[in-house]
Design a protein with these regions (language model features):
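Conserved HGGG/HGGXW glycine-rich cap/lid loop of the alpha/beta-hydrolase fold
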Residues: 6-52
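Conserved acidic catalytic loop of the alpha/beta-hydrolase fold
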Residues: 61-79
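Gly/Ala-rich beta-loop-alpha elbow adjacent to hydrolase catalytic centers
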Residues: 83, 87, 91
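Flexible "cap/lid" loop of the alpha/beta hydrolase fold
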Residues: 96, 100-136
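Conserved alpha/beta-hydrolase catalytic His-Asp/Glu region
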Residues: 139-203
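Short beta-strand/loop motif that positions the catalytic acidic residue
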Residues: 204, 210-212
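Acidic catalytic loop of the alpha/beta-hydrolase fold
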Residues: 214-219
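Catalytic histidine-centered segment of alpha/beta-hydrolase-like enzymes
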Residues: 239-255
Length: 263
């Protein structure tokens, strides 16, 4: 599977998988720091950024198939992997399948129950349609702290502090991905995430670290316990000052966690 991607740095490879509506640029706040220590491979997942959508079903399973094919194409099977949001669930699925090494899963989606599931779908779908409608004025909105505070209130603990260029890029990509709505529906209404088979470390090839923002308003913190129940060999790390995207709110802490957990 051909995925548009960037490769930076030298050293042991490290795969970065973005979230729903993102692209490789979603890692821009931590990319250079990670590339100073590792060779970073950051693809655009199918239907986002510069990678065309899949021909058929769009789901965690089919995205995992596509990423596995990409890893095989580039000789990267067994690579350490970091994921954010939907990408965080994706790296857990890849670990369950045994195709990646050490994993850092940042605020993974998919561990909601009851009202949380409805809340996730309704708020994210509403954000998508609003962002699409606001595209003509998006440069002005993302160019001010007040505008960023309004746009990113659900996603960041410090939305006004998200860099203006990062905010604009995210809002452009968020609105443009043809796979956004099909994947959102699949995430909410599709199969729940399976855990790893029983065994050492949950029978995954490498250790799993699940990072969660204490102020996550997308995947609320109570969901962390369910993620750990699904992957009982995982270690939980709390970002005390972060929302849904620790790479935005606490980039230095995120880099330290990734390097420490995959080293």
């Amino acid at each position: 599977m051909t995925l548009h991607h960037v490769r930076r740095g030298t050293g042991r490879p490290l795969l970065l998988l973005h979230g729903l509506g993102g692209s490789w640029r979603s890692w821009s706040t931590v990319l250079d720091a990670l590339a100073a220590e590792r060779e970073v491979i950051a693809p655009d997942l199918p239907g986002f950024g510069a990678t065309p959508p899949l021909a058929g079903e769009v789901s965690i399973a089919t995205l995992a198939d596509a990423v596995t094919a990409f890893l095989d194409e580039h000789g990267l099977r067994g690579v350490d992997a970091v994921g954010s949001s939907m990408g965080a669930r994706l790296v857990l699925e890849l670990a369950r399948r045994g195709v990646v090494g050490a994993v850092v899963s940042l605020d993974p989606g998919g561990f909601w129950q009851g009202w949380e599931q409805v809340f996730f779908y309704d708020t994210v779908a509403s954000s998508y349609h609003l962002v699409r409608a606001l595209q003509p004025v998006m440069p002005a909105l993302t160019g001010t702290a007040v505008g960023r505070a309004a746009l990113f209130a659900q996603f960041s603990a410090r939305p006004w502090a998200v860099p203006a260029d990062v905010a604009l890029t995210e809002m452009r990509t968020f609105a443009a991905g043809p796979s956004f709505i099909p994947l959102l529906r699949s995430l909410v209404h599709g199969p729940t995430q399976q855990g790893a088979p029983a065994g050492p470390r949950g029978a995954t090839p490498g250790p799993i670290t699940i990072g969660w923002g204490r102020h996550d308003r997308v995947c609320v913190p109570r969901q962390a316990a369910r993620a750990l129940a699904t992957f009982p060999g995982a270690r939980l790390y709390w970002f005390e000052r972060s929302g849904h995207f620790p790479q935005w709110d606490t980039p230095e802490e995120t880099v330290q966690l990734v390097l420490r957990s995959t080293g």
